[in-house]
Regions:
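Short, surface-exposed loop/turn segments at secondary-structure boundaries that line and modulate
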Residues: 3-11, 33-52, 148-171
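Glycine-rich anion/phosphate-binding loops
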Residues: 11-19
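Glycine-rich, mobile lid/loop segments that gate access to catalytic sites or pores
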Residues: 18, 23-142, 154
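Conserved small/polar residues in nucleotide/adenosyl-binding loops
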Residues: 179-181
Length: 182
C-alpha cells in the first residue's frame, strides 16, 4: 500500500497487515503466510483496510502474466519517483531458461518527508533458500544498505527476493556451483 506506512501503529497495524494478506491469499488461492505486505507513506496513521482490500480485489481481477502488467506494477509503487525502475532478463542455467525480474521505488528524498525504498526481485530459478538469502544479503550490503538521503533512512525500507523454482534448472546450492550460466 502507498500513502500510509503502517509503522508505529501497534497491534491494530499488525491486524491490518494480516487482513490484507488474508484477503490476497484467499483471492489468489495461496496460503496467507505466502503473501508479503509492504507499505510506504505517512508514519503513525492506520491503514483503511476496507479500501485496501477493495483494491486487492481489483488487482486480482486484472492480474496478467505480461510485460505490460509488470510495467504497470512498477509504476503503481512509485511515489516521489520521476521514472519507474524495472528490468527483466532471461538466461540459461543448466540448459533451462531462467527469468529474473526486478522493480523498485524510491529514493528521491527522505527527510523531512520520509520516502521509503521498496525493491522486489523475482525469479523462476531453482535455488536453495540458503543461497537465495546469501545472494540477497551480499547484494544489498553494497547497494541498498549504502543509500542515505539527507542522512536518513526510512522505517519501511524493504527488499524482497523470491524464487519459485519453476524453471526446473539444476538447483543452485553453492556459491561456486559448476552449473554454467550463460
Amino acid at each position: 500500500n502507498s500513502g500510509i506506512a503502517n509503522a508505529c501503529t501497534g497491534k491494530q497495524g499488525l491486524d491490518c497487515c494480516e487482513a490484507e494478506a488474508k484477503c490476497a491469499g484467499e483471492l489468489l488461492g495461496v496460503p496467507t503466510d505466502a503473501v508479503l505486505v509492504a507499505s510506504t507513506g505517512v508514519i503513525g496513521m492506520q491503514i483503511p483496510v476496507d479500501k485496501i482490500t477493495a483494491g486487492i480485489e481489483k488487482l486480482v481481477a486484472a492480474k496478467a502474466d505480461t510485460l505490460e502488467a509488470g510495467s504497470d506494477a512498477a509504476h503503481a509503487i512509485m511515489t516521489t519517483d520521476t521514472i519507474s525502475k524495472e528490468i527483466a532478463i532471461e538466461t540459461q542455467i543448466g540448459g533451462k531458461t531462467v527469468t529474473l525480474g526486478g522493480m523498485c521505488k524510491g529514493s528521491g528524498m527522505i527527510h523531512p518527508n520520509m520516502c521509503t525504498m521498496l525493491g522486489f526481485v523475482t525469479t523462476d530459478a531453482k535455488i536453495s533458500k540458503k543461497m537465495l538469502q546469501e545472494a540477497l544479503s551480499e547484494d544489498v550490503k553494497d547497494t541498498y544498505n549504502m543509500v542515505s538521503v539527507d542522512g536518513d533512512t526510512s522505517t519501511n525500507d524493504t527488499v524482497l527476493l523470491l524464487a519459485n523454482g519453476l524453471a526446473e534448472n539444476p538447483e543452485i546450492t553453492e556459491k561456486l556451483s559448476l552449473i554454467h550460466i550463460s
